[in-house]
Amino acid sequence: MANGKKLIIILCLLIGITSYNHIGLTMEKKPYHHVSDGTFRNPEGSPERNTNFKWSYKVFNKEKKKLDMTVPEEHVVKKEKVLSDLSKLKNDDYIAWIGHATFIIKLGNTTIITDPVFSKNAGPLIFGPKRFTEPALKLNEIPKIDLFLLTHNHYDHQDMMTIRRFPFKDAKVMLPLKLGKYFTRNGYRDVNEMDWYDEIKINEKLKITFLPAVHWSKRSLTDTNKTLWGNFLIEYDGKKILFACDTGVGNIYKDLGNNMAQ
């Protein structure tokens, strides 16, 4: 009986050691930006974010009142001209800035939209920071979209009102790890979560690669860095376009420049 107990104890210890080693090996295989608790972090050697900084709407609004918030009339292109220009260029390649981080990029037969935000406010409530100017187009005025790129989950980039009301839910969605649920829940059928350096070939001329950025993610008090963030490299017919996430500086950009900018 004593020998039987010893055998059980030894087996338990062996199982524990094997499990521990398996977990260790699994984590060793994961890239640096994957943290063991399931969150993400910036590329190795990136500047550290100051976690002691506290955001305050009171301070923000106080400082904002000191600024001249008047937008020069010539800064905003008239709606008629925007629609006219897009109509003239419908058979050409173009990049159109809609506002903030929202661009419409037409390359061949593929039309891309980036971080579309058509709401008046950026935040979980209607009282979030308000945009200075309206987007160049309304959501129901944009051309047919084939490819939807999302860099990260901050409210001024991942706008749930726009995602829910987006008129082209058959578009291919490309976005960081762990953000797909926001789209599948809202009727999108072609949702592709991507890790850094993942690439997807759209057609013979067009390829999209998801690249590292020096940033972070957060939409609530409890989800800091639980979803990934990043940049998109758009390669089309020998040309390269980098659509950058909100990003700080970091050594990673020297590496990306050396490896991707050729």
Question: Predicted regions: what is each one?
Answer:
Residues 183-195:
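Helix-loop-beta element that forms the nucleotide-linked donor phosphate-binding surface
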